[in-house]
Amino acid sequence: MSKGILGKKVGMTQIFTENGELIPVTVIEATPNTVLQVKSVETDGYEATQVGFDTLREVLTNKPAKGHAAKANTTPKRFVREFKGLEGAEVGAEITVDTFAAGDVVDVTGTSKGKGFQGPIKRHGQSRGPMAHGSRYHRRPGSMGPVAANKVPKGKKLAGRMGNKRVTVQNLVIAQVLPEKNVILVKGNVPGAKKSLIVVKSAIKAK
């Protein structure tokens, strides 16, 4: 059965195993999520579980959102996402961090940090030219295609806005789960800035 939860990135720290090994981990705070709706093929055309996270102040919401949340006996949520494969979920039920356990393999999704307008070296990892004073080619994009075409081919890797994209890191391992603090510790780093929304779900390519 697939598992999933919404949370916020707190930052990074490190923990030590019993044999003294140091492990860098990302701290994800996931307060209890509320199941807002269970979608079915008969009524919605597909199966999914709609989950809400982070209570939204009443002044910032509207009547449709209030009515939708009231069906689950809860308050409107700041973040609403859908998961597929969450079997047995009922409207109004809560999903907590203890649905996961240490050693679980998960996929983590977030929005990467925006880097602004960047050149091809930083954005695509292109090699730079010689830096000697006789060279006129240092950090330019280089050839953009053949002469005869008289145009730049689609998909050419050039300078542009970098980051601020939805990124999923697959097959990360959960190091620890702290139910009393609503915290999940994931080995390694995950995309996104501090306080940004993080989606943790069972890995689809786990070995």
From Swiss-Prot:
Q: Would the keyword Membrane turn up in this protein's UniProt record? A: no
Pfam families assigned to the protein according to its UniProt record, in alphabetical order: Ribosomal_L3
Gene Ontology molecular functions:
rRNA binding; structural constituent of ribosome
Q: Which domain of life is it from?
A: Bacteria
Q: Which UniProt keywords apply?
A: Ribonucleoprotein, Ribosomal protein, RNA-binding, rRNA-binding
Q: Where is this region: Disordered?
A: 113-148
Any one GO CC term of the record:
cytosolic large ribosomal subunit
- Gene3D superfamilies found in the cross-reference section: 3.30.160.810, Translation factors
Mind listing the GO biological process terms from this record?
translation
Protein's UniProt keywords contain Transmembrane helix:
no
* UniProt xrefs under PANTHER family: 50S RIBOSOMAL PROTEIN L3, LARGE RIBOSOMAL SUBUNIT PROTEIN UL3C
- Family of this protein: Belongs to the universal ribosomal protein uL3 family.
Q: What does this protein do?
A: One of the primary rRNA binding proteins, it binds directly near the 3'-end of the 23S rRNA, where it nucleates assembly of the 50S subunit.
Quaternary structure and interacting proteins, as annotated: Part of the 50S ribosomal subunit. Forms a cluster with proteins L14 and L19.
Q: What is this protein identified as?
A: Large ribosomal subunit protein uL3
